[in-house]
Amino acid sequence: MQIIAQPPTAPGTQAPPSFAVTASVSLQTRRLRTLKHEDTFAVLNAAGDIAHASEAEGLYHRDTRHLSYFAVGINGTRPLLLSSMVRDDNSALTCEFSNPEIRDETQVQLEQDIIHLSRAEFIWQGVFYQRIAVRNFSNSRKRLKLNFAFAADFVDLFEVRGIHRSARGHFHPPVISSSYVQLAYTGLDNQTRSTQICFDPQPSRIDTNHAEFALDLEERGYSVVHVAVRCNQSGGRRRPSSAFLSGLRASRNALHQAASQAVSIETSNDIYNEAARRAIADLYMLMTHMPEGLVPYA
C-alpha cells in the first residue's frame, strides 16, 4: 500500500492527513483538469483533487494560490477513479468513483465497488464549489467516513514557477467553526488573503486541515455533501447547498451567452468542426473582464 506524501503546510499549522492509496489507483489521476471564472482558476488532477503542491496544482485567485492541497477519501483511503470529464462548455468537472476494498487489521470494513461517489466541481465569482453524492449499492446498511483534507500556502504564481523569495509574510491562526475553517495570510504588501472552506451539512469532526463526515447509509441509500471554498470572502453568504445549483446555472448561462456572440465555423469535416467548437469554448473560458473590456488570460 502506497501512502501519498504530505503537502507543505504553513508554519504553526498541522499537516493534513495523508490518505492511503491502493496499488490499483489509476495513473489517469495525474492528468490535469482546469476550471476558471474571471480572476479565479483551479488546476486539478483528474479526480478533482489538489494533490501535488510542489507542482502547478492549486486553487488560484488573483495570482495567489488559495488552496495548495485538497483531497477526498473514504475511511482514510482514496476512492478509485472511474471517469473524469470537463463539460463541453468548460463550466464544470464531473468525476465518478468507486471504493476499493477497505480493511482494518482484522476484517474487511467495506467490500470493493459497493460505494459510488459522484463529484461535481465548478468556479463562480471567486468561489470553488463542490457537490459529492455518496450512494450505497449494497443490500445492507453501511457506515463509513467521508474525509476531506486541505491546506493553503498562499504562494504567488512566480513562486509556483520556481522563484525563491528570501522573505515572506505571516500566517494567521486558523479560525474554526462548526461548519467551516478559515485560513489567512498577510503578505509583505500588507494585504491579507483568506481561504474559507465551508461544509454543508456540518461535518462530524473539523479541525485546522481536516473535516470528516460519519455517514450511515441504508440499503441503496445515499447522502450529499456540499463544499464551498471562498477566496477573500467571509460571512453573510448562502449555504453551499443552496448556492451550488444557482451558481452552476449562472456559470453555464454566462458561458453560453458569451460563446453565442462568437463567429460560428462549420465545414463538411466533423473532426475540424469539433476542434473549432472546442477552441471557441476554451477561448471563452479564458476571457476575463477588465476595465478595457474582455481579455483572454493565458
Question: Where are the model-predicted features located?
Answer:
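A eukaryote-biased signal for short, well-structured alpha-helical docking elements
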Residues: 29-31, 39-40, 53-108
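Substrate-binding groove/exosite segments of carbohydrate-active enzymes
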Residues: 257-298
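Polysaccharide-binding surfaces and accessory modules of carbohydrate-active proteins
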Residues: 2-58, 104-107, 111-219, 228, ...
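Membrane-interacting alpha-helical segments
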Residues: 89-104, 185-189, 279-282, 287
